Every structure is written in structure tokens, then in C-alpha cells.
């Protein structure tokens, strides 16, 4: 995906503490959806056009499904054709 031209590139701090309100067994899943929703609102793009890098997902899941980070910093790259990538900075 790195071959396309970049329209916009920003680093965003995403608060994930709202995921701790969900059940312990669903926290990591909820954190991924919170990340997708947050980037969707900030970049004004449809949720279906967002691609999350596996390293970002591993960072959320690294301490298990119940103990997620309360916030994380990600790099968001908006491409010309309308898709958005979420990667680690």
C-alpha cells in the first residue's frame, strides 16, 4: 500500500480508556473498534476504507485481551484514492 501517493499524514493520540467500560473479555476487540471510529471522525472518512497495520493490533493485544493500553499514538496516512492506513509512528 506504500506505492500510492499520500494526501495527508498526521500523528494522533487515541484515547482507549472507554474500552475499559466493556466486559473484560471484549476489551481488546472494543479498543480496535474505538480506534477505527476515532480515526474515522478525525479524518472524515468511512470506516470501511480504514486499514489497520498488524503492528498496531499487536500493540493493543500485547498484554492480553483484558489489559489494554489506556491511550496510544498512531500515524494516520490518508491516500489519494480515499483509503486510510493506521500504522505505528
From Swiss-Prot:
InterPro entries: Ribosomal_eL31, Ribosomal_eL31_CS, Ribosomal_eL31_dom_sf. One of its GO terms (biological process) is translation. PROSITE patterns: RIBOSOMAL_L31E. GO terms for cellular component: ribonucleoprotein complex; ribosome. The gene is rpl31e. It comes from Thermoplasma acidophilum (strain ATCC 25905 / DSM 1728 / JCM 9062 / NBRC 15155 / AMRC-C165). SUPFAM superfamilies: Ribosomal protein L31e (SSF54575). This is Large ribosomal subunit protein eL31. Belongs to the eukaryotic ribosomal protein eL31 family. Keywords: Ribonucleoprotein, Ribosomal protein. Coiled coil: none annotated. It comes from the Archaea. GO terms for molecular function: structural constituent of ribosome.
Amino acid at each position: 500500500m506504500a506505492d500510492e501517493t499520500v494526501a495527508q499524514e498526521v500523528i494522533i493520540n487515541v484515547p482507549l480508556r472507554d474500552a475499559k467500560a466493556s466486559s473484560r473479555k471484549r476489551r481488546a476487540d472494543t479498543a480496535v473498534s474505538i480506534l477505527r471510529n476515532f480515526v474515522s471522525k478525525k479524518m472524515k472518512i468511512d470506516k470501511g476504507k480504514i486499514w489497520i497495520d498488524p503492528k498496531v493490533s499487536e500493540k493493543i493485544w500485547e498484554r492480553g485481551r483484558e489489559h489494554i493500553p489506556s491511550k496510544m499514538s498512531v500515524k494516520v496516512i490518508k491516500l489519494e484514492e480515499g483509503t486510510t492506513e493506521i500504522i505505528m509512528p
